[in-house]
């Protein structure tokens, strides 16, 4: 794998991934964070794929059957720091739905790379100026880099995706030679039920080592689906019998608008350079003799929060056993 070059690290956040879809020109999709695979009401259907972030460790192996089937679009990760975009694009290339439009950037990439081998596909992806520009639009603005000794390296965090193709579920990991077949499901079965034990096993393994992870789902654009439902209800509401349902849909659409606006604001904050402000604030606090105490308090609070989150995850996994 080549050096990071001009690819930046980006956060594992549904707002980042959803806006990245918009940047690529994708229509009909969004990304949602999942806190549990057991809460069916909280999951949007259909779910086109899952994106799993975990801390990669030497020797970690996933049980599965390597597959070189031609109907799976798979590209290697050939450059560091691009694993988030790599995972998302590997997933998008395998979505087969007429309601989903990939847009010019990804359609051109797919048409060019479809007949290439996985490694060459990866090089084509990492050399795409348009894809890199969208990826780097989420870079954190800073005047310098801090080398914090003893901290966890962001480079060790890695994304993989799970995608249903035919009646099999595959793990697409750009660091592997081939996709892995990790589950099988019947035609009438929800593929999420088939992959659930695999993901829960990985979550349990990583939580035991106090290693953070998160899970996101690629799902239909909720606002578009709600608007389609609204149009159907309005057409069927000849006797004003569906006013309550229409009101509920209006509220759900407003909630989606609010969520997307929050995503936009958070992404703008990510792009803003706060360094001059922080430096000036630290100077003032140091001059007043408050800086060391505040840093110590913040460090202890962060440790306690991390321990609490780990304990909650362990309890949740034990409850499911």
From Swiss-Prot:
Cystine pairs: none
Positions of the record's site feature: Important for enzyme activity: 173
Coiled-coil positions: none
Site (Transition state stabilizer): residue numbering on this chain: 77
Listed transmembrane segments: none
Keywords per UniProt: Hydrolase, Protease, Thiol protease, Ubl conjugation pathway
GO MF, one example: cysteine-type deubiquitinase activity
Entry-linked InterPro entries: Papain-like_cys_pep_sf (IPR038765), Peptidase_C12_UCH (IPR001578), Peptidase_C12_UCH_sf (IPR036959), Ubiquitinyl_hydrolase_UCH37 (IPR017390), UCH_C (IPR041507)
Enzyme Commission code(s) on record: 3.4.19.12
CDD domains: Peptidase_C12_UCH37_BAP1 (cd09617)
Induction: Expression decreases with age.
Name used for this protein in its record: Ubiquitin carboxyl-terminal hydrolase ubh-4
